[in-house]
Amino acid sequence: MGIHLVLFLFLASLRLALSQDVEHGLILVEGTQAIAETDDNFICATIDWWPHDKCDYNNCPWGNSSAANLDLSHPFLVKAIQALKPLRIRVGGSLQDQLLYEVGSLKSPCHPFQKMKGGLFGFSRGCLQMKRWDELNHFFNNTGAMVTFGLNALQGRHPSGHSVWRGDWDSSNAYDLINYTVSKGYKIDSWEFGNELSGKGIAASVSAVQYGKDLIKLKEVLNSLYNNSDLKPLLVAPGGFYYKDWYDKLLQVTGPGIVNALTHHVYNLGPGSDEHLDRKILDPEHLSKVEAIFRSLSETIQKYGHWSSAWVGEAGGAFNSGGRQISNTFVDSFWYLDQLGMASRYNTKVYCRQTLIGGNYGLLDTTTFVPNPDYYSALLWHQLMGKTVLAASSDVFSPSLRTYAHCSKGRDGITLLLINLSNETRFTLMVRDRVPVSSGGHENATKIHVENSFLSHLKRAFSWIGRKGSDVTFREEYHLNAKDNYLRSQTMLLNGVPLEFTNDGEIPTLDPLLISVHSPIHLAPLSIAFVVFPYFDAPACAAQTKL
């Protein structure tokens, strides 16, 4: 009886192993030249203005996460920002175009946002007290954050039907805020003009011609107020959804040197109420659709505004506060990291995640301030991925394997980001550069040859070993999985270990596995991996600035 049971269990386990697909492949990295470059500080997160009673789909997930009432003294918040130092924080969102500043000649009383029928987004105007502005700036200074602050771009305008707003922008209140900021010596890295007013807008829109004229006015304000300052903040705009004709016209109207960065928003997963968000996240075809926007914006900048650059100013995946029990769980990292990799390929300099805290899509839990899985994804990117982007491709047939390559951050070599969207296929991968070793033969350096023999891959895979750093026999691997293989888990595993605050309340160290460079990379189904090759021979990385 016992022998039969053992035999049954063996056969069952063998059947399970055989039922899991294994696909072998070769990843080629073009290390001779960069294809794109990000900013030194690519990772960014937002702090919004939504009050606690902002609700979507009978869910009110914002709590006290607004820039107006966030607990700036919470140790988890401070440590989370400092671990990403310098983290760019974009302060802004839907309500910023209804926000006044209690400074200078403002005559109206300074009240917080309140629910109001007929108001934009269902809220009244709000007001930022200078006491709170002081507190925010002291907080930013203490945590080492780089600040992008969104200004009210509707002040002075009037609605004229169909969500279109007309009239010149009234710069007086913004002037007083910026003047106060300069007088206090507060370091604002960039000022952003407006939120989601481009094209058709969301609740309101402004024509590209009018917007451009007002940006020229704002640039004059900045040049005047910062004339005697060592600080020279950037002007970024429009913080909206990308409409090609609108963005083209904006650059043509403003001309050279006005807009330092074009910001656009990404919510390519649709509404947070969608019951199939996780399916969209794991669908490679759906994830790839947004690539057309990155490509088109890059072309717009090359044609009309070479002095400018592309930023993702806000991206939460699913709009209306994100997907409940999706955007704050492990499965969202498939979307988030794929976005970071894809945006980088198109010279996106900055990528701002909606949000640092607040809504369902916060990097930190709104109530406990404990990091959600995407926080650790951002932290790994911040620690490992340099600003120089390399071309990476593979001969894997499955579209479920997503591959991105950068020069490593602050050291020699390269770092790969590998994403496996398949729930069935395990990938066994070799890595090599595209530059062939001279051996008397000829090899096409720009085309991947699909071969049936995995051993052939193995023989070719380490052509770079010996040309540089031949004494290094290990690579670093960081494998990310969901706890208990439950994709909606709020706990991420790094190499099998849960990522949680230490007993001392510190962010955990992100320790890699050291794997022989002579062995293949094994990427499990529904997993993500960062793989660092410390001495991969990539000439494009030689000149990379050490951070």
For the regions a protein language model found, what residue spans apply to each?
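Non-catalytic accessory regions flanking glycosidase/transglycosidase catalytic cores in CAZymes
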Residues: 2-261, 290-313, 317-547
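Substrate-binding/catalytic cleft of secreted carbohydrate-active enzymes
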Residues: 197, 201-206, 265-293
